[in-house]
């Protein structure tokens, strides 16, 4: 029971949740500064993830993104692993009804693809594996210890398919790294790995370090602003392809629609790239100039100068005195 008093207003409420709902209940171990479970799920939904392809997280940490991706892919309720809720202690709590709802898995779906995670830290991989086991997702998630620059997927025989896959990363933001150069170099390696090892995939990266995000070297297809705790973060989308961006745009499924949109904009607003040249004397205009018309002469201006030596009286002078 919560009571909140503000001036003459008193609010009485019942806590139906108990522990914060962002705590799913599957975490048995943590790495340093793991991402919030609710934020991870929100990022996946914003990216359009519903289990329609393979999923990769090359910096998986404690495995939060991997587990949330598996839950969404199978449409499993996020609070299924919680030990309890606050409303279970209410006097009118219906235990039978709650058990019926809790055990209802009729809306869950089959996940036919796979989820892959990796991290350079052996400890992080161990933590991720424990959490994955706690969530019962070992069948759908594989985690290995491997450095970012050593990842090999695209073009490797027998490797997981990256075409149409989702890649999502929550890299270090720079607060815990010793030097700024280390951060910039890390983000440069991320860009190279995404470009050459995840060809055909769509990548999403969240970070509060805008300067480091520029070092990725890829043009964002989309940008969003999210809050990770108190940090204002960029959440960028990258379309990964071979060759140059202009060539990829021509073969992209939306290229025809983009061409139509451009034609409509040009038709409506004109071509901003059209050439302008100075007008010459011999140029002929395609319109008639305005004909000159004879207008009546303007009336003479009024002359406000005094026509006599008449002056207004000042101070204690009278009208008679002022005329003298």
Annotate each language-model stretch with its function.
Residues 3, 58, 62, 171:
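Conserved beta-strand/loop positions that form the S-adenosyl-L-methionine
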Residues 35-153, 182:
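Conserved S-adenosyl-L-methionine
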Residues 146-258, 269, 273:
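C-terminal catalytic and target-recognition region of SAM-dependent MTase-like enzymes
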Residues 1-26:
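Non-catalytic substrate-recognition/targeting regions of SAM-dependent transferases
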Residues 157-161, 196, 230, 237-324:
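Basic Arg/Gly/Lys-rich low-complexity intrinsically disordered segments
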Residues 25-35:
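Class I SAM-dependent methyltransferase Rossmann-like catalytic core
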């Amino acid at each position: 029971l919560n009571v909140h008093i503000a001036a003459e207003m008193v609010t009485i409420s019942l806590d139906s949740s108990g522990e914060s709902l962002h705590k799913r209940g599957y975490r048995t171990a943590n790495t340093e500064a793991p991402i919030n479970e609710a934020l991870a799920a929100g990022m996946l939904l914003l990216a359009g993830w519903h289990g329609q392809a393979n999923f990769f997280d090359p910096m998986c940490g404690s495995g939060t993104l991997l587990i949330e991706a598996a839950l969404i892919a199978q449409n499993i309720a996020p609070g299924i692993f919680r030990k309890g809720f606050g409303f279970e202690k209410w006097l009118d709590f219906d235990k039978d009804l709650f058990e019926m709802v809790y055990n209802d898995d009729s809306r869950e779906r089959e996940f036919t693809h796979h989820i892959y995670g990796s991290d350079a830290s052996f400890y992080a991989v161990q933590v991720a594996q424990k959490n994955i086991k706690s969530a019962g997702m070992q069948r759908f998630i594989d985690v290995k210890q491997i450095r970012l620059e050593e990842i090999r997927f695209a073009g490797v025989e027998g490797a997981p398919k990256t075409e149409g896959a989702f890649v999502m990363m929550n890299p270090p933001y720079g607060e815990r790294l010793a030097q700024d150069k280390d951060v910039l170099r890390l983000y440069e390696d991320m860009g190279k790995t995404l470009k050459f090892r995840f060809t055909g995939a769509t990548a999403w990266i969240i970070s509060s370090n805008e300067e480091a995000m520029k070092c990725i070297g890829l043009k964002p297809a989309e940008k969003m602003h999210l809050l990770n705790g108190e940090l204002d973060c960029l959440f960028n989308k990258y379309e990964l392809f071979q060759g140059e961006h202009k060539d990829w745009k021509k073969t992209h499924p939306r290229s025809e629609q983009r061409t139509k949109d451009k034609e409509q904009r040009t038709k409506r607003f004109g071509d901003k790239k059209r050439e302008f040249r100075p007008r010459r004397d011999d140029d002929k205009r395609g319109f008639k100039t305005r004909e000159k018309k004879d207008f009546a002469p303007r009336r003479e201006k009024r002359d406000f100068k005094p026509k006599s030596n008449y002056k207004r009286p000042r101070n204690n002078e009278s009208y008679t005195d002022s005329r003298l």
